[in-house]
């Protein structure tokens, strides 16, 4: 429950949560950023973690001196790349067993199908593009590994996608962090980013439940 409470506090009051990490020292601050980004992208059981909003919020704090922007980007790149690589390997070695177990409730047949279709449509480029879609960015590496994509091809697009995604959201927070409106309405902006990430999930769950009722 400790980790769940940790995430709940981050979502409830991101400004206070991140400020407390920074106050605890660089190891805690950068470590928390790395941990959340790595787990969201690397562990298929946690696709709901707030990766986009955390990167934006961290960039905001970097603008105000809480993080060193170069160090923050390096941490974000490392977490995103290593996370996807871990997810790929989990899918490669344990993918079918995990799906068959039914223990990953977020991995509904609809989401698996959507991720597979995304891979079929875009091929290797799906690894890059999938970074910008919540849930898909967690499931695509897993399914790519399970489906036998060559490791070398995956690595290339993983690195490109990880660097691009983490840089875009971090720098958005960094460059917009000095705007008075952003400073005054920081929490609302974070809630908005989280909402955009969660809405597709809620819609998917509703559709799945309605589908079961109609069967």
Language model regions located:
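MFS transmembrane alpha-helix packing/gate-lining sites
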Residues: 79, 164-165
